[in-house]
Amino acid sequence: MKKYRSIWVLIISMFFMASAYTMLIPFLPLYLLELGVSQARVHLWTGLVFSSAFFVAGIMGPVWGKMADTRGKKRMAVRAAFLIGCSYFLGGIVHNEWQLLGMRIFQGFANGLVAASMAIISSTVEEKALGTYLGFAQTSIILGGICGPFMGGGLSHLIGMRDSFFVAALFLWLVTAAIVIFVREPAHAPWKKSQEGSIADDLRYARSNRLMFELLMAYFVLQGTIMMIQPVVTLYIGELQHSMSNVAVTAGTIMSCGGIAGALTTTFWGRLGQKKGYYRAICMTISGAGLGMLIQSIPDSIFWFGVCQAMVSCFIVGVNPSLNAALVKCTPESFRGRAFGLSNTAQQMGSMIGPLLSAGIMEFMPIYMVYILAGIVLLYLAWRMYQAHLHSVSL
C-alpha cells in the first residue's frame, strides 16, 4: 500500500505544480506590461522571458536525470519542488523586465519535478498498469491546468499578479514537504561503477536507440508547437474581443474549459495505448490536435475559439501519457531517470524554440498564422510517427 501512497502523493503534487504554473506563466505578457514594458516591445520580451527558462532547463535535464539514477529520484523531486517555489517567490519581488528574465533563468535551473515524479511512478507500478497510472498523472497535470488559469485570473483581479507569485511559492513548498514525508522511492539495484559514463555517453546511447530517439524528437516537436501557442493566447483573445479589458479572466476561463474537456479524455487515451499500442494512440492524438489548431485560426468570436480550444485539448492531453509509456518500454530500468531527464530536455528545448518562433511570426504576420503553422507541424509529426509505427508494432 505504501507504494500506491507514494504514487498518489506524486500525482497530487503534480496537480499543485501545474496549478502554480498555469496561474502565472500564461499571463506573463500582462505582467511585463505591468512592469513597464511598452506594447510595441512586449512580443519580444515575452519570447525572451518564456524561452530563457526552457533553454537552461534543457541544458540541466540530462544532469538532473543522471543524478536521479545515481543519487535517488526522490532527492531530485525534493530539490526541484523547493527551488521552483523559491523561483516563484523571486517572481513576486522583481521590479523590471531584466529581473523577471533572471527569475525565469533560475526557474529553468530548478526544473525537473515532473521528470523525477514520472521516473518514480514508472519504476513503481507494474507494466500492465503503466499506461493507466501515467494517464492519471497526466490528468492531474491537466486538472491543475484547469484550476490554474481560473485562480490566476481571479487572483490577478483580487490581489494583483505580484502577490499571486507568493501564492504559487507556497504551493511548491507544500509539495516539497509532502514528498519528503510521504514518498518512498522503490528499492533498486545498487549503482555500479561499470554503469558510470559521461552525459555525452548518455546522449550517444539515446541516439543509438532508434525508438528512444524518435520519441525524444516527438517530445521536442510537440512541446515546440504547444509553446508557439501559449504566449499568444491572451493577445489573440484580446484581438477577438477587440479589447484587452479583463482579458486575463476571459483567457483563464477558456483555457480552463479546454482543460476540463481534456481531463475527461486522458484516461481513455491511456487505456487505448495499453490495448491497441502506444504508437497508434500517439498518431491519433497528434493528428486530432493538429487539425484542431488549424481550425482555431478560423473563428472570429470568443465562443467559437473556446469550442476549438476544447477540441484541441481532448486530443493533445493523450499524447504525453503514450509517449511516456513508450519511453519506459524501450529503455532499461537502470536508465529510467536519464531517459526522463532527456525527455525533459527535449521538451524544454521545444519550449524554448516555440515562443521565439511565434514572436518572429507575429513581427511579420497576423497572430492567427501561428495557429496555422502549429497545426501543419503537428500533422507532419503525426505522419512521421505513423511511419515509425510501421516498424515498431511492439509499441
Language model features by range: what are they?
Residues 87, 98-106, 292, 303-311:
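Paired small-residue
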Residues 103-141:
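Cytoplasmic helix-loop-helix junction between adjacent transmembrane helices
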Residues 1-4, 185-217:
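Juxtamembrane intracellular "pre-TM" segments in multi-pass secondary transporters
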Residues 113-125, 318-331:
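Intracellular juxtamembrane helix-capping segments at the cytosolic ends
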